[in-house]
């Protein structure tokens, strides 16, 4: 089974870890902790404070994370979740595993990195490890929270537009819980 290195919100204790252990997404088995053999820039940026590993080997810091063995279904889910290849790119990376006796072993695993990014991202602070609640003060903004605020705004817009449409037509279509449509006609103008 393929190995995947996670360094950000998919790590244990981080906001998206639940996606990695959700069996409906596929199977993922924790193997060990590791760090990149080469330094990479791990930056936190964007409206949601997303951690990105920029595919610029030799720059930044050696990054700590976790290696998981995943089945094909989980790999496909991760590609979808990471919007690969449009948003992130899945590439192979060399990782160093520290053994209990002080020796190291090198393993190769897939990692989701950014090859396309804003030029100023290379000037952002880099990190060797990610924690959403870290000292950096850049807490990850849950996608669900962002979606909820977007939905709340769309709902408010919809309600306002519906009210205007009702006043215009003096009728209202109501969808009941059984899914039946009912037309309600008003005898006078709505106030």
Curated annotation (Swiss-Prot):
The keyword Lyase belongs to this UniProt entry's keyword annotation: yes
**Gene Ontology cellular component list:** cytosol
Q: Please give the Gene Ontology molecular function terms for this protein.
A: gamma-glutamylaminecyclotransferase activity
Query: What is one GO biological process annotated to this record?
Result: modified amino acid catabolic process
EC id: 4.3.2.8
User: Which Pfam family, any one of them, does this sequence belong to?
Assistant: GGACT
What is this enzyme's catalytic activity, as reactions?
Answer: epsilon-(gamma-L-glutamyl)-L-lysine = 5-oxo-L-proline + L-lysine
Q: Which residues bind substrate?
A: 7-10
Name this polypeptide is given: Gamma-glutamylaminecyclotransferase B
Q: Which gene name belongs to this protein?
A: ggact.2
